[in-house]
């Protein structure tokens, strides 16, 4: 997906003109990014490329990828217009030597497939912890200006009451629950990052990101669709949406472009050692209600929501993640898209 797509271009324009981001700090600088082939990484990298071609910002982008050919294919349109984007072949457990100066780091690579949390928990937690420490060591050796670690709302764990979750709220995670290998790993990396800030004065910040709404490719082409992708796929094909749980968990959501502006704002701020929630507080609702809302307002009630519960532990237990983004708003950020508009935009992106 690139700027020939109207919605995608609008998002790029919004990001590069967000006046609360200190964009000038990125001019003629080098930024190292992990996780560029995921949704957030793709949008982030594309926005930097777009900034370069629109305003000649000369931001050099070094992207760590496991498969260069796959990355080149995914970013083929961006590579045609900007020679500041380059790929480094490697993974988090084996980062190759990098001779270039690095000014900024955004670490977004992480396992995100729920099935892996149950089937390969050792590999998941090792990848999260060991890989992230390798990135922190790279940041330390390069004497960077700033780093952002992309964490998750899942670190808050199993909240059974609907209290507002602030960055200093207790994390309710259970080491006896194998699926918690993911949020436990993310939480430990948060602690390791804070330790690097305390002991080595490494300028790192952490973002706990809500359920993100967005797409980077046509959902028809995705084999193993996640919940948001499945909703869009079903609307496009006029198929009923089938939930494997009752959908009772409640959470906040966030549109992809608002995630990117949060990342860049925090990356280029002068405060470090901080944790920020990234959420559109007005979107807080149950999964069940959210889907019904989308069916009514985006699918025009042409499809139904069906519940077919599966006896499995690959999904989180019912919980309530009501994130507050007050702290992030206090440094200038604000969300720009409400829940229904998020889905309308994603739906429009996929219409042939």
Predicted regions and their residues:
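C-terminal substrate-binding subdomain of Rossmann-fold SDR/epimerase-dehydratase oxidoreductases
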Residues: 1-7, 59, 86, 235-352
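Active-site helix of classical SDR
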Residues: 181, 185-188
């Amino acid at each position: 997906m690139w700027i020939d797509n109207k919605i995608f271009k609008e998002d790029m324009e919004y990001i590069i003109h967000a006046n609360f981001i200190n964009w000038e700090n990125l001019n003629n600088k080098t930024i190292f990014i992990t996780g560029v082939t995921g949704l957030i990484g793709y949008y982030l990298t594309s926005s930097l490329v777009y900034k370069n071609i629109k305003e000649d910002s000369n931001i050099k982008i070094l992207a760590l990828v496991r498969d260069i050919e796959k990355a080149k294919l995914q970013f083929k349109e961006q590579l045609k217009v900007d020679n500041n984007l380059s790929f480094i072949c490697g993974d988090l457990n084996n980062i190759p030597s990098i001779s270039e100066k690095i000014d900024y780091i955004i670490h977004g690579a992480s396992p995100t497939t729920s099935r892996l949390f149950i089937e390969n928990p050792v590999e998941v937690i090792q990848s999260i912890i060991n890989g992230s420490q390798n990135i922190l060591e790279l940041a330390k050796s390069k004497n960077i200006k700033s780093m952002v670690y992309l964490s998750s709302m899942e670190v808050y764990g199993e909240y059974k009451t609907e209290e507002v979750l602030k960055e200093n709220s207790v994390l309710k995670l259970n080491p006896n629950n194998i699926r918690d290998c993911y949020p436990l790993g993310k939480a430990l990396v948060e602690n390791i990052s804070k330790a690097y800030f305390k002991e080595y004065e490494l300028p790192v910040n952490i973002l706990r990101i809500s359920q993100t709404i967005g797409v980077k490719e046509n959902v028809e082409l995705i084999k193993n669709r996640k919940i948001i992708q499945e909703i869009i796929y079903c609307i496009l094909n006029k198929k009923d949406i089938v939930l494997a749980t009752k959908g009772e968990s409640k959470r906040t959501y966030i549109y992809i472009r608002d995630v990117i502006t949060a990342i860049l704002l925090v990356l280029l701020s002068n405060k470090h050692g901080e944790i920020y929630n990234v959420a559109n507080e007005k979107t807080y609702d149950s999964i069940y209600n959210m889907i019904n809302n989308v069916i009514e307002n985006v699918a025009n009630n042409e499809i139904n929501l069906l519940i077919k519960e599966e006896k499995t532990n690959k999904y989180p237990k019912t919980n309530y993640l009501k994130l507050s983004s007050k702290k992030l708003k206090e440094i200038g950020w604000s969300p720009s898209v409400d829940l229904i508009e998020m889905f309308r935009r994603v739906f429009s992106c996929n219409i042939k």
